[in-house]
Design a protein with these regions (language model features):
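Acyl-donor (CoA/ACP) binding surface of acyl/acetyltransferases
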Residues: 30, 34-142
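Conserved GNAT-fold acetyl-CoA-binding loop/helix
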Residues: 1-21
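A short helix-loop-beta-strand connector motif used in the catalytic cores of GNAT acetyltransferases and
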Residues: 20-32
Length: 142
């Protein structure tokens, strides 16, 4: 991961590798984002159960994009397609969390129709042991 992406990432490289192994073992969903003309992987979207909601058909998204491809619409296109697919599978609500400082990601979620739910102050220790406030967003068809 590049430095621009790591600053908004709560995992170390080792934790990220372990998460990939867990996904393979537990069959959680992960989508790679590829460039159409070269098939180069430029990012990923991870889908997991929303563990903050109880007895609700809810999933949580997290996503990463190589900084060379920021602000080109790639993540918007990928998330839009995934959200449509999840709602077709009768998911009730989809959540996402972003660090307070990650204004571009917050704007992306809002553009996709997510609503701001609130802030967990000092919610996540991220890269280089920096503690971040964590913004919560969700989208629902209900």
């Amino acid at each position: 991961n590049d430095m621009a992406t790591l600053k908004f990432n709560a995992m170390t490289k080792y934790e990220f590798a372990e998460m990939i192994r867990d996904i393979e073992r537990e069959h959680d969903m992960m989508y790679c984002i590829e460039l159409k003309n070269s098939n180069n992987v430029i990012g990923a979207v991870f889908i997991n159960p929303d563990r903050l909601r109880y007895r609700v058909n809810a999933l949580s998204l997290s996503y990463y994009l190589d900084c060379r491809y920021y602000r080109n619409g790639y993540m918007y296109e990928a998330l839009q397609a995934i959200i449509i697919k999840l709602f077709e599978q009768e998911i009730d609500i989809i959540s996402a969390r972003v660090f307070k400082e990650n204004t571009a990601s917050a704007r992306l979620l809002e553009k996709l129709g997510f609503q701001y739910e609130g802030c967990l102050r000092m919610g996540v220790t991220g890269y280089q042991e920096i503690v971040h406030d964590d913004f919560f967003y969700s989208i629902s068809l209900l």
